[in-house]
């Protein structure tokens, strides 16, 4: 697999759904806004078939709006590990997903209905090991509430 580009709304949510449906070991999601029901269902189904699922959601917008309460409550109802993004930042606007520690999605799109049907957004899918590892390391540091320093050899823009 080489890097690929998903262009929304043309490509729809299908590539993201397919990745979650095909996950065998793990799914890590970090999302600013998550309310798209087909993706919620896919994440729940992955968990139910034994895939380790971890979801990190931005807790509140700058204006005080809480977009992710419904998603968090639903996912936790199914026993999925959900946490808020790192409190070191006022908000986390990152949108990413790592599947089976093998490939990562780096996205401009939130997982909301309009991002898959109305807005021009993008996702880059990378299987490049050092890029995937950087995303995993940042995710796990945020999850554990530890500092993340990608170092001078980082290949991604942090």
Question: Which functions belong to the PLM regions below?
Answer:
Residues 1-24, 30-158:
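HKD-type phospholipase D/PLD-like phosphodiesterase module
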């Amino acid at each position: 697999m080489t890097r690929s580009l998903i262009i929304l709304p043309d490509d729809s949510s299908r590539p993201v759904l397919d990745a979650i449906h095909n996950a065998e070991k793990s799914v890590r999601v970090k999302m600013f806004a998550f309310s798209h029901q087909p993706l919620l269902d896919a994440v729940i189904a992955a968990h139910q078939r034994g895939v380790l699922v971890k979801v990190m959601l931005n807790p509140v917008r700058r204006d005080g709006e809480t977009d992710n309460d419904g998603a968090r409550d639903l996912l936790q109802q199914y026993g999925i590990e959900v946490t808020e993004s790192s409190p070191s930042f006022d908000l986390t606007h990152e949108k990413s997903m790592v599947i089976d520690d093998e490939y990562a999605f780096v996205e401009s799109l939130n997982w909301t209905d309009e991002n898959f049907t109305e807005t021009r957004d993008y996702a880059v899918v990378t299987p490049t090991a050092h890029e995937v590892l950087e995303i995993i390391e940042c995710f796990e540091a945020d999850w554990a509430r530890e500092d993340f320093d990608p170092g001078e050899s980082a290949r991604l823009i942090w």
